[in-house]
């Protein structure tokens, strides 16, 4: 049976890179939704795009990894009109919620399940931003031979956004933990996996 658990690996950003993003996001500009993806560019965020994904210093993130994420200093249920200085901060959190009934961390939160007790308070009051370069997803049907072990493994696909050096993914947090929010896959993602961040 094919499990719909997704996104258990992404390439994160360093503390310095997260701090740079926070400084740019809280530069006093009003928060506005873009008309189209082309409105955002590398220059708008003034953020260095990696020259080569294979040689760049990578921060590989897996469940239980401790990494920096961007957290609001305000109650996300109330919101703010603009992201002023101090509205966002870096927090070093562990990927995955712990629970009494599951020994493994719960690292994805289905948006359709946001009203369940484990997610409810975080979804309403404690949303966060997971900033990454790209994320990986395993195919549900395709396999390949591992160069390292010689065993058959699921084919991995890397997902990015064209002309965007950083992807912002919705997350929620509590205490020292965070979880990635997922939804049904769009047309680009669906051939590989039924869910996406």
Annotated model-derived regions:
Residues 1-197:
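Short linear sequence motif anchored by a di-proline
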């Amino acid at each position: 049976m094919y499990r719909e658990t997704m996104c258990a690996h992404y390439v994160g950003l360093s503390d310095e890179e997260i701090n740079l993003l926070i400084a740019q996001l809280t530069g006093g500009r009003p928060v506005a939704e873009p008309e189209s993806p082309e409105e955002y560019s590398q220059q708008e965020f003034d953020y260095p795009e990696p020259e080569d994904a294979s040689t760049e210093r990578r921060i590989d993130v897996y469940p239980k990894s401790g990494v920096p994420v961007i957290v609001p200093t305000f109650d996300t249920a109330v919101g703010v009109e603009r992201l002023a200085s101090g509205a966002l901060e870096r927090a070093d959190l562990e990927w995955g919620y712990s629970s009494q009934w599951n020994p493994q961390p719960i690292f994805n939160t289905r948006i359709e399940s946001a009203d369940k007790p484990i997610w409810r308070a975080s979804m309403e009051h404690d949303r966060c931003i997971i900033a990454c370069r790209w994320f990986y997803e395993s195919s549900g049907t395709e396999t390949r031979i591992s160069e390292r072990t010689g065993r058959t493994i699921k084919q991995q696909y890397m997902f990015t956004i064209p002309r965007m050096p950083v992807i912002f993914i919705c997350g929620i947090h509590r205490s020292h933990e965070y979880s990635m929010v997922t939804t049904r896959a769009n047309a680009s993602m669906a051939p590989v996996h039924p869910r996406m961040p």
